[in-house]
Swiss-Prot record:
Chain intervals for the UniProt region annotation (6 X 3 AA repeats of [GA]-Y-[PAG]): 1-29
Domain of life: Eukaryota
Biological role: May be involved in the remodeling of the basement membranes or of the vitellin membrane of the ovarian oocytes.
Extent of the Sequence repeats: 1-3, 8-10, 14-16, 19-21, 22-24, 27-29
Keyword Repeat among UniProt keywords: yes
Keyword terms of this UniProt record: Repeat
Protein name from the UniProt record: Glycine-proline-rich protein
């Protein structure tokens, strides 16, 4: 499992990247 994207995360579909706060976002809507 992975942490859900929080509001304000720059998320890109198909890409795992670190968003604000250091948590990864996996294609979740910002």
């Amino acid at each position: 499992a992975y942490p859900a994207a929080h509001q304000g995360y720059p998320a890109h579909v198909g890409y795992a990247r670190v968003g604000y706060g250091g948590y990864p976002s996996y294609g979740y809507p910002a």
